[in-house]
C-alpha cells in the first residue's frame, strides 16, 4: 500500500465551508485523503469524486466506502469533463470544489508509471493509462523545436535548447526508452557547475514532459472556468498548486472573476464582480506540516467564492 499524505488537508476542508446537505466535488481524488474528510461532514449532501487514474479509483473506494457508500459517486474521468459529466447526472450547481494539483505519491512511487527520475522505468508519465501519448513518444518523435518549446514553457529550464539538442543527437543513435536513459542524456547536456548544484538536474525536464503528456495546464484552465460557472451563491473553489505555472493560471482566473474592468469615462456605478477572493495571498503550509510532508514546501492554496 502506498501512503499519500494530502497537503494542506485541514486548511482546505475548513475553507470549503462544508454544509451537511451540500453538493461538493473533489476534482483530484487520488487516494481519497481530502474526499474522506469532505464525505464525513455530509449527511444528506453528496460528493462527486473525479480521477482518471485506475489505481485512484481502487484506493479511494477502500477509504470512502466505510464512511458512506450512498453519499459519494466516483467518476472515472479527467476533471476537464466536470461540467459535462455532472450534467449527465443531473447536477448543474455545486456548493464547492477542491483541486489538489500535485501528482499523487503513489504515482511517483510506483516505478513503472515513469513519473520519477529516482527509478529506472519506461518513459510513461500518463495519468490516464488508456491514452496513447506517453513521454517516450514525445522524447523520441517530437521535433527539436517542439522539445525546446515544452522544456522552456513547462519546465522553465535555462538549458532547454542544449537538452533538446542532446536528445536529438542521442535518438539518432538509439531510441530513448527509460527514465534513467533520459536522465543520462540530460546530464550530458549540462555544465559541471549545474550538475554540482543541489537538486536533481532532470527535475524541470521531467515536469515539462509530465505537463505535456497530460496537457495539464490547458485542462486545468478549462476545468476551473467551468467549475466557477457551476458554483451556487456562497459556493467556493479551493485550488492547491505545486508549481508557478499552475499558480499563475489560478491567480489570473481568480483575479479576472473577482474584478470588473470598467473603461474610464463609462458611467457605471455600483457594479460588483460576481466572485470574491477569500484570500489576497495564497495560504501555505505551516512549519509542522513542512517537517512531516516534503511535498508541502511548494504548495499554495487559493480560494474564491461566488457572491
Residues covered by each model-derived region:
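S-adenosyl-L-methionine-dependent methyltransferase catalytic core, i.e., the SAM/SAH-binding region
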Residues: 1-307
